[in-house]
């Protein structure tokens, strides 16, 4: 069995502030980041904050997500040199979907376009 990719065992609470910072550098807000995460995962704001507080790793964070949005298949493009829609591993694909949506936010895309 292959060892888990280290990103799977990374705490969500460690990557979350990086998303907020990335957005903030382009004058986008924490609220917008949270809205994107809630859209993708189905977490409520309270549920999202609980996952951060519990220091869940990314694997757990996505495993516990109440409802991965059905329109994730519409998220396309390249993150870290890889086409998100071609990523085989479902967990890695979800992590990269989130990266991609945050990139779109930081690149000035309108929220109604990001939340497909």
Regions of interest found by a model, annotated:
Residues 2-116:
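A charge-rich, low-complexity, intrinsically flexible signal that marks solvent-exposed coils, linkers
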């Amino acid at each position: 069995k292959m060892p888990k990719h280290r990103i799977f065992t990374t705490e969500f609470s460690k990557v979350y502030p990086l998303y907020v910072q990335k957005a903030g550098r382009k004058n986008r807000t924490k609220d917008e980041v949270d809205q994107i995460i809630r859209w993708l995962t189905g977490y409520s704001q309270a549920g999202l904050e609980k996952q951060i507080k519990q220091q869940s790793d990314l694997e757990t964070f996505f495993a516990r997500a109440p409802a991965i949005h059905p329109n994730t298949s519409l998220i396309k493009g390249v993150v870290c040199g890889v086409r998100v829609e071609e990523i085989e591993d479902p967990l890695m694909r979800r992590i990269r979907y989130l990266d991609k949506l945050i990139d779109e936010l930081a690149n000035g895309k309108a929220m109604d376009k990001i939340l497909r």
